[in-house]
Design a protein with these regions (language model features):
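Basic/aromatic-rich interaction segments and small domains that mediate binding to polyanionic partners
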Residues: 2-11, 15-71
Length: 71
């Protein structure tokens, strides 16, 4: 869990509609593969960046854990 100031930061940087590319996801069950792009659908109060991926999946990114960048 990240602190409230970091959640505010993540919400200020990643806005609904922003495009994201995934470089590394730490999900042992169903990670998003390297280079997959998607669109941010929102950031929740825990700082999870929710993404609708171009491959049809919806899965959140964890700031500071998963590797990703704006396109």
């Amino acid at each position: 869990m990240i602190d409230h100031s970091m959640v505010r930061y993540v919400k200020s940087v990643y806005k609904k509609g922003d495009r994201i590319v995934c470089y590394d996801m730490h999900d042992p069950y169903a990670p998003i593969t390297y280079g997959t792009e998607g669109t941010v659908t929102g950031v929740d109060d825990a700082g999870i960046i929710h993404v609708k991926w171009d491959n049809g999946r919806t899965l959140g990114l964890i700031y500071g854990v998963d590797g990703f960048a704006k396109c």
